Structures are given as structure tokens and as C-alpha cells.
Amino acid sequence: MPIKIPDTLPAFETLVNEGVRVMTETAAVRQDIRPLQIGLLNLMPNKIKTEIQIARLIGATPLQVELTLVRIGGYRPKNTPEEHLFAFYETWEEVKGRKFDGFIITGAPVETLDYEEVTYWDELKSIFEWTETHVHSTLNVCWGAMAAIYHFHGVPKYPLKEKAFGVYRHQNLKPSSVYLNGFSDDFAVPVSRWTEVRRADIDRVPSLEILMESKEMGVCLVHEKKGNRLYMFNHVEYDSTSLSDEYFRDVDAGVPIKLPHDYFPHNDADLPPQNRWRSHAHLFFGNWINEMYQTTPYELEKIGTGD
């Protein structure tokens, strides 16, 4: 089944050209099924690129999904035109009366700040609390995952001496997990962050279970059954060129940066990188959406009521 997004969203044409099944809003209303309602709180600076990355993965699943783009109310990003925000996004204040089958909270380029120093921290805390009563399943990504696990469990983040940057091998620690159905025992995941959470802190919280881990990069994916939350600390959603774009952005800005680990062929930045994580990215999002579909109430208003 396709993903339902506005016909004029820039991601629409890109996804159609890639062969992703996309449905116009007009066509969607003719299907006599309830689409899954998924919200995307997009905290990334380049919102259009993130929209494409997430919609690509959601749109490849066999279920109809209606994606709602959400933004922080009082914060104006510098890298996305205001007309795009007003045309396609709703503020959290505008959607907080609704309920969602799934909700994604992305990363943000603020990880070197203490959480309390982030401009929109108070609003984000309110959103975290809101997900407990208005969302069936929440997927927190990178800094969004670190912020969420800190908010709910006090798990701290630690600064790294240098940026964790590249493609690293990860291990499947729980092959029986519904979220890792079809996963290999060992697989590649893109990593791009300046901070980390540590296994020792997570192990102290009985409700948290580590599903993916890297010997070099540490914890990657944590599941919390009680709150129906996933914490993904790395970037399975990244495009083939995402790490390359970040690398050359920093090089052009004069920021000291090493070549991303195990990314460019022969460590030659002039060669196009090969995507070695795409299939597992699709598996992960497909598994998340399938589990959501199997367990969410048919009547949206029952989400968060325990019925």
C-alpha cells in the first residue's frame, strides 16, 4: 500500500521517480480502510531531505499510511523556507488534540548542548509526555532518542572525543524481536553523532532492552515495552550520500573532520559510496509499522485508554 502525502510536497515527485508507491489525498479517500496515522516531528535543519528519507521507508510498506508533518511551535529553522513550513507542517499545538498510531521524533544538531539549554526543551518535554496518552508507538531517532531516554529514565549522554562518523557493523542481539524480523546477525548502520549513551546506564533500567549494538559504536537500538517506545541512536534512514554531504559540508566550512569510517570505497572521497544498509532500513521500518498495525486499536480515540 502507498503512503498518503500532499500532492505538492517536494518529496512527492522524488518518491514517485524512485518507484515508491505514493497516493494522492484524493485517491486515498476512495479506499475503504483506515490508514495508519503517523506523525513526524522533524527537528532536523534540512527538513525536506528528512521528509524524503522517512517517507521513502514508510511508503515501501504494504499498508496505507497518512503522514502528518509536525514542527516545534516557537522555533524557526534557518535551512527550510518558511513557506514550506506553513504549507506542509502543523505545530504540535495544532495536532496535540489528535491521536496517532505512530510518531517519529528525529535527531537535531544540538547534541553538544545540555538538554536544558536547548531552546525548545520545555515544549519537547511536553511532547514526550503527550506521546504516552496520544500515541500507540513512538520511534525516537539519534538526538531525539537520547533526549527521550533521558526524559523518561534519566539516562545521560556523554560527549565523544571525536565524532562517531561512518558505517559500522552492528550485531542483532534479539533475533526473536518483532522489530528485527528478517535481520541478519551482523549488518551495517550509518552513524553520525558527537555523543553517546552507555550500556551500563541502560542496563540499570529493567524496562529497557537493547536490541542492536556495535562493538565499536556501542548501543544502537533499545526497545521499551511498557511505553511502546523505540530508541534508535543511529541513522538507518540515511540516504546513500548523507554522510558524504555532511563530510563535504564540514570540509567546506573548515571544520576538522575525518573521512567517515568504512564508507567511501578505498577511503577515496572522490568515489561514490555504496549503500550497504538500505535493505535493513526497509526491514526495520516495515517491522515497526507491521507491529503497529497488528496492535493498534482500530478506533483511534481508544489509543492511550488501555482498551
Curated annotation (Swiss-Prot):
Q: Write down the EC number.
A: 2.3.1.31
Q: Report which superkingdom the organism of origin falls in.
A: Bacteria
In chain numbering, the residues marked as site (Important for substrate specificity) are 192
Q: According to its UniProt record, which reaction does this protein catalyse?
A: L-homoserine + acetyl-CoA = O-acetyl-L-homoserine + CoA
Recite the UniProt keywords alphabetically. Acyltransferase, Amino-acid biosynthesis, Cytoplasm, Methionine biosynthesis, Transferase
User: What's one Pfam family the UniProt record gives for this protein?
Assistant: HTS
Query: One biological process GO term for this chain?
Result: L-methionine biosynthetic process from homoserine via O-succinyl-L-homoserine and cystathionine
Biological role stated in the UniProt entry = Transfers an acetyl group from acetyl-CoA to L-homoserine, forming acetyl-L-homoserine.
Instruction: Give the protein's recorded name.
Output: Homoserine O-acetyltransferase
Q: Which organism is it from?
A: Sinorhizobium fredii (strain NBRC 101917 / NGR234)
